[in-house]
From Swiss-Prot:
The protein's name: Spore germination protein B1
Organism: Bacillus subtilis (strain 168)
GO cellular component: plasma membrane
Entry's transmembrane regions: 289-309, 323-343, 353-373, 375-395, 410-430
Protein location: Cell membrane
Chain's gene name: gerBA
Function: Involved in the response to the germinative mixture of L-asparagine, glucose, fructose and potassium ions (AGFK). Cannot stimulate germination in the absence of gerD and gerK gene products (fructose and glucose receptors respectively).
Pfam family, one: GerA
InterPro entries: Spore_Ger (IPR004995), UPF0353/GerABKA_families (IPR050768)
Keyword Acyltransferase: no
Keywords: Cell membrane, Germination, Membrane, Transmembrane, Transmembrane helix
Single Gene Ontology BP annotation: spore germination
Principal location: membrane
Length: 483
């Protein structure tokens, strides 16, 4: 329905659809020499009243309009310098007013003006809680989309940085922003991102995690194929490598596509520290992943099937420690891993000081009590504890879950088939990873199949002076980053 030039007719129509809301405000006033009637529509609490008074009402009342104008564009000229747009239908008014904008309707004007006076409580910029680095920027994204895009603009002063906005959610009308560098990001990736976003048909988009599940390549895989981050510097570096970022209003977590398995293991401060220690740290992380997945399964297979592979003294020591334990190795390991997962989850849900105390005291007390009660052996406590510690070295929290799930599968296979079961799970996981795609790009590439340039920044990192080209696996338009 089009907006009529008669103000009273417009208000009668709007009050039928919006008037049942107690926080819906209809502020009427007069302006100009002819004292034309006007009305401001806004949601109390979503709109900054001082901005309305200073930038909307005051300029109108100061202008000496002698007669009614015939075009809403003429009225729009009085608000030069203040962000606003022209609306022409009642449906537009309903959508914009509930998103926090104020609508100006004036008698004699066929149309209205929408002013961006949204006022939403937000927190100040702070260090990301989920991606703490020893050296690097200490500022993370917040829940306000415009602040997040400004942080990107501030860090990337490249005129080729493109930020396009769109609205998702049939009812909530959630704003999202897609960021990419035009002369670096491959066109086919950008087109694929917009294609998937436009295919999303949902009532509400509460968080970027929901969007991630709607546009990912492999919804039935346990491995994430989209990287999420709170750090503007990480988004910046990804954009400069030819990736695309998606930011959602109301959440501090940005999405980065396409993502490879390396991205979940690397940390932002890998590039702010010297290359030798950081290369060793990366090797430590990759080793920790293997320990997280395979150590309990290897222990079970060696104790249950392949004791001949152990040194004689070690085999005797293990047998002695398990002499009075009533459970087989798998049950031992499962009890301890289940207990550690309980402690981990309790530590996350409880207030931070209490959670840290529960994690420390709970692990020590329960482990000691289990050994003294001869429910588990002391060596099993050591194995499970080392496994849990190794899992904490993975920078990506989302990548921890698949590793822990695979660990249970390795334990079951080791219990049934020994070392052959461990090898079978290993081959299955590698095959599954090689099958995965992330927005048309391979999720994992065998080391021997990677170009030499990409090998310089995978398991280890060579000096920055030699990283002159962008990773070819991202297929960037501009391949040179250092001349």
């Amino acid at each position: 329905m089009q907006i009529d030039s008669d103000l009273q007719n417009n208000l009668d129509t709007l009050k039928k659809t919006l008037g049942q809301n107690d926080d819906m405000m209809f502020y009427t006033f007069a302006f100009g020499d002819s004292r034309q009637k006007a009305c401001l529509l806004y949601i109390d609490g979503l709109t900054e009243n001082k901005m309305l008074a200073q930038y909307v009402i005051s300029p109108l009342q100061k202008e000496a309009l002698a007669h009614k104008e015939c075009s809403i564009e003429d009225l729009s000229a009085f608000f030069f310098g203040f962000h606003h747009s022209v609306v022409s239908t009642m449906k537009e008014i309903e959508q914009l007013v509930f998103s926090g904008q104020a609508i100006l309707l004036a008698d004699g004007y066929r149309g209205g003006l929408a002013f961006d006076t949204k006022s939403v409580a937000t927190r100040s910029l702070d260090e990301p809680s989920s991606e703490v680095v020893e050296r690097g920027p200490k500022i993370g994204f917040i829940e306000k989309l415009r602040t997040n895009t400004a942080l990107l603009r501030e860090r990337t002063s490249d005129p080729n940085l493109v930020i396009k906005e769109m609205t998702l959610g049939k009812r909530t009308k959630k704003k999202i922003a897609v960021a990419y560098i035009q002369d670096i990001a491959p066109d086919y990736v950008v087109k694929e991102v917009f294609k998937r976003l436009k295919s999303v048909n949902i009532d509400n988009l509460p968080e970027s995690g929901t969007l991630e599940q709607l546009i990912e390549d492999e919804p039935f895989s346990i491995f994430p194929t989209i990287l999420s981050t709170e750090r503007p510097d990480r988004v910046e570096s990804s954009l400069l490598e030819g990736r695309v970022s998606i930011l959602v209003d109301g959440t501090p977590f940005a999405l980065i596509v396409p993502a490879t398995v390396d991205e979940f293991i690397h940390s932002p401060d890998d590039y702010s520290q010297r290359w030798i220690p950081m290369s060793l740290v990366r090797l430590l992380r990759y080793s920790s992943i293997l320990i997280t997945i395979y150590l309990p399964g290897l222990y079970i297979s060696l104790v249950s099937f392949h004791t001949g592979l152990l040194p004689t003294r070690m085999a005797i020591s293990i047998a002695g420690s398990r002499l009075n334990v009533p459970f087989p190795p798998f049950v031992e390991a499962f009890i301890m891993i289940f207990t550690i997962e309980l402690i981990r989850e309790a530590g996350l849900r409880l207030p931070k000081p209490i959670g840290q105390t529960i994690g420390l005291i709970g692990g020590v007390v329960i482990g000691q009590a289990a050994v003294q009660a001869q429910i588990v052996s002391a060596l099993m406590v050591i194995v499970v504890s080392v496994t849990a510690l190794a899992s904490f070295t993975v920078p990506s929290y989302a990548y921890n879950f698949p590793l822990r799930i695979i660990r249970i599968g390795v334990m079951i296979s080791a219990t049934a088939l020994g070392m052959y079961g461990v090898i079978m799970v290993y081959l299955f996981v590698i095959g599954h990873l090689m099958r995965l795609k992330s927005f048309g790009q391979d999720y994992i590439i065998p080391i021997m199949a990677q170009p030499g340039q990409d090998l310089k920044d995978t398991v280890i990192r060579i000096p920055t002076m030699f990283l002159k080209r962008r990773p070819t696996r991202n297929d960037p338009e501009d391949n040179i980053r250092q001349r």
